[in-house]
């Protein structure tokens, strides 16, 4: 039996599609359905590694958890990871499939369409219900001919569509009506209604606006979801980095400074610290902001050499070394760890047009980028250090193209 589908689209990026999709998944899972999430194509700086070593979007991993199932590459067959200079690495069915710019990517539309439809069909054969998430807005009329992720999928799966709008940004009724007006007649028939997300205040003050809107658009507002400040869900495409910052210096607080770079990736490694009351977390993009914290974190990067050069040019690394000599600890994650060595080499220019760059020299090691990408989940135990007790069991993952020589 082929699964039925329901699709969540939005008036734009960041309106709450991923969380609403997860909530719907959870509802049907709790109601006894065998349900799974799906997103045809994702653009994300952050990714999740499945048990089989495949990369997918973190939102689909979170949604799978809401469904009570393990994340599967079928849930997100295409993942695009921006790497700078208008290029993105293409992850096809969980594995790297080269890099390209937007123009070249659209030339692959026919191939990618087959991949997406095959993945969705396989998922529908395994489950009773598939909750599909769109991307951005279905009203991107300049990109409509290459659509893989919004109304194209809704049409193929004969899926009813709910459109989500974000009232916290302002102008939600204009966003929703504008989106609806730019849809074709056939697409409008698929829309079952709208949801207003992130509402603050008195719902009675919103009621007249909803009534007027429903007089202009022949589709109902199905519900209003309140703004929830403490909802902790991994971000995918961007990060409201300054909202995570807290006042440093309080007694008993661990002051942590994260060095911000233009090509930062998998910043979800750090985001849990923002919700720990014992941590004061700040993001640093200027030397004046770095004042001898307890811990400095160099995060991952989609272009390690060019981010390293950027930090040198901004004299941020010089300040990092000064803080280190004054007692600050340094923690490097992925590309940030590679920066702590002697050299980083990219002889095949897999990430950068620059083939070699000197690191900070804090570790006697050298990094060389290779063609084969390693993605896997791991288990480990910590060794005793100033940061960790010995023997703490941890789960984690590896995503890298590099070999480190020690």
Regions found by a protein language model. Give the residues of each.
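Conserved phosphate-handling catalytic cores of large alpha/beta enzymes
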Residues: 348-349, 354-356, 371-376
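Catalytic nucleophile serine of serine hydrolases
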Residues: 334
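Glycine-rich nucleophile elbow surrounding the catalytic serine of serine-hydrolase chemistry
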Residues: 338-340
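Flexible phosphate-sensing "switch/lid" loops adjacent to ATP/NTP-binding sites
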Residues: 2-322, 329, 349, 371-372, ...
């Amino acid at each position: 039996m082929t699964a039925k589908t329901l699709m969540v689209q939005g008036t734009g990026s960041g309106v709450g599609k991923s969380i609403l999709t997860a909530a719907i998944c959870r509802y049907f899972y709790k109601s006894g359905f065998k349900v799974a999430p799906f997103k045809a194509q994702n653009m994300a700086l952050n990714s999740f590694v499945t048990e089989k070593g495949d990369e997918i979007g973190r939102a689909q991993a979170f949604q799978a958890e809401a469904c009570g199932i393990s994340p599967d590459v079928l849930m997100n067959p295409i993942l695009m990871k921006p790497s700078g200079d208008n290029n993105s690495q293409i992850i096809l069915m969980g594995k790297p499939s080269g890099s390209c710019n937007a123009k070249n990517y659209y030339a692959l539309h026919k191939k990618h369409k087959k991949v997406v439809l095959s993945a969705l069909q396989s998922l529908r054969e395994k489950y009773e219900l598939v909750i599909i998430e769109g991307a951005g807005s279905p009203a991107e009329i300049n990109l409509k001919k290459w659509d893989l992720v919004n109304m194209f999928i809704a049409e193929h799966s004969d899926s009813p569509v709910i459109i989500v709008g974000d009232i916290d940004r302002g102008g939600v009724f204009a966003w929703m009506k504008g989106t609806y007006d730019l849809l074709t007649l056939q697409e409008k028939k698929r829309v079952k209604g709208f949801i207003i997300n992130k509402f603050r205040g008195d719902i009675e003050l919103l009621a007249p606006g909803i009534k007027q809107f429903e007089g202009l658009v022949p589709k109902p507002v199905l519900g209003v979801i309140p703004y929830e400040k403490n909802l902790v869900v991994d971000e995918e495409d961007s990060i409201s980095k300054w909202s995570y910052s807290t006042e440093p210096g309080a007694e008993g607080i661990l002051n942590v400074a994260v060095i911000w770079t233009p090509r930062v990736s998998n910043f979800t490694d750090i985001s849990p610290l923002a919700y720990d009351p014992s941590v004061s977390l700040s993001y640093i993009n200027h030397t004046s902001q770095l004042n001898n914290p307890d811990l400095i974190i160099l995060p991952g990067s989609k272009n390690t050499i060019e981010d390293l050069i950027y930090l040198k040019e901004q004299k941020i690394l010089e300040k990092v070394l000064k803080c280190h000599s004054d007692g600050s600890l340094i923690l490097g994650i992925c590309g940030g760890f590679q920066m702590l060595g002697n050299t980083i080499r990219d002889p095949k220019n897999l990430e950068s047009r620059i083939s070699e760059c000197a690191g900070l020299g804090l570790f006697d090691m050298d990094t060389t980028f290779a063609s084969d990408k390693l993605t896997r989940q791991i288990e480990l135990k910590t060794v005793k250090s100033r940061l960790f007790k010995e023997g703490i069991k941890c789960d984690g993952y590896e995503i890298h193209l590099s070999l480190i020589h020690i």
